[in-house]
Structure formats: structure tokens, C-alpha cells
Amino acid sequence: MYRGFNLTITDEDFEDLKKNEMFRFRTFLRKLFNKVVEDGLQKYLIDKERLDGDVMMEDWFPNVDADIFISHSHHDLDKATALMGYFQKFGLSSFVDSYVWKHSDKLLKLLDNKLCYNEDRNTYDYGKRNQTTSHVHMMLATALTQMMDKCECLFFLNTPNSANPKSDISKKVYTHSPWLFHEIATFEYIRKKRRISKYAAEGNTNFSLD
């Protein structure tokens, strides 16, 4: 991660941004990337009571190559998609979790039905439910942190869906989502890499550190 940007997109900006092929094919993209796991948890089983978290994390929240991390409310997915298409015109790839990762709630439902459900009482075990939620949320938080560290920069879409409208973008941002809070907080502490720029001048190859 090199730098972060707090971005406010107006309705007029959005109208211009969504004029790209990626935005027009957004429904197809969601169906392509948001696949439902059909084989349940069988592939993750170590034994009757243990699951392989590493394999599960690689399957549900894989680490991919991307230049830009777009932090957004899921209610602003269309805006994130439009921005992703805009960056693509410049040869820059963007990470938008909804397109690359499966939904954590679906994984939780699979785990809870497998490990926490009591058929005799037709209820879920409260303690076990807390454990599955903790494990899945920790995997997701770890995956988000890894992707943020890997990307060149972060764009936070500052909208009424993601932040308190009264927030002063020059100061603190008050968010409604625990995941957006995690991303904003992580950016404050994540390592800031020195960016190396390469350019040629009069036949000589030079390097500069920004």
C-alpha cells in the first residue's frame, strides 16, 4: 500500500463513470464471480469435527493481483463497478471484494448447519455459533488486510451509505459498517511502501523514490 484517497462521487460523476463496458456487464460479472459452493464443506474436512481453515480461506477469500483496493459499502456496488471500469481504461486492475470473493454469510450458514445445529431441539448452539462466526470473520479480516497491503493504493468511496453525512472528510470518517471500519483502521497502521518510479532520460535508465 502506497497511498489512500477519500473519494466523494456525486450523481453527476456517477453518470459519467458508468459509461464503460464493465458497468454495462455488471450483472453478468456478479453471476460469474459470485458462485455458490455446491459441494458444501466436504472438501475442507480433516475429520468429523475439524476443518482445514487454510484451504477454506483460499477458496472463499483468495489472494489476487490488483493495483487498487476499492473500499465501499455493498449498497454502492454499482459505483464501485463504474470506478473499476474507469481505472481499467488506464490499464489498472481494481479489487472489489463482491466480484472476487464469496459471501461470508453463506459460509457461516454452511458451517452452522454442519457444526452448530441441534436436530433434537431444532436450535443452534449459541457457543458454537460464536466460534464459527469468530473464525469466519477473522479469516475475512485477514484476507482484507492482505489485499490492502498488496495493492498500490486505496480508494474509499465516501457516500451516505458508507459514512456519516456529517463527517468532515478532512478529519475523521464515521462509518456504519464494521468491515469499512476495519479497512479504514487497517490503512492507518499498514506499512506504507516507498514507491519506485522508473523512467528513461537521454538513453539512461534512472530510478527515483517518491
Residue ranges with predicted function:
Residues Y2-C151:
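Conserved N-terminal substructure of TIR/SEFIR domains
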Residues D78-K79, K102-K106, S162-S167, T205-S208:
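Short catalytic/ligand-binding loop motif for oxyanion handling, primarily in non-cytosolic enzymes
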Residues N113-T123, F181-A185, F207-D210:
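Acidic, Ser/Thr-rich peripheral helices and adjacent loops at domain boundaries
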Residues N158:
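Glycine-rich, N-terminal phosphate-binding loop of Rossmann-like dinucleotide-binding domains
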Residues E58-F61, R191-D210:
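Charged, low-complexity C-terminal accessory regions
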Residues H135-V136, S162-K193:
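Conserved TIR/SEFIR loop-to-helix hotspot centered on a Trp-containing motif
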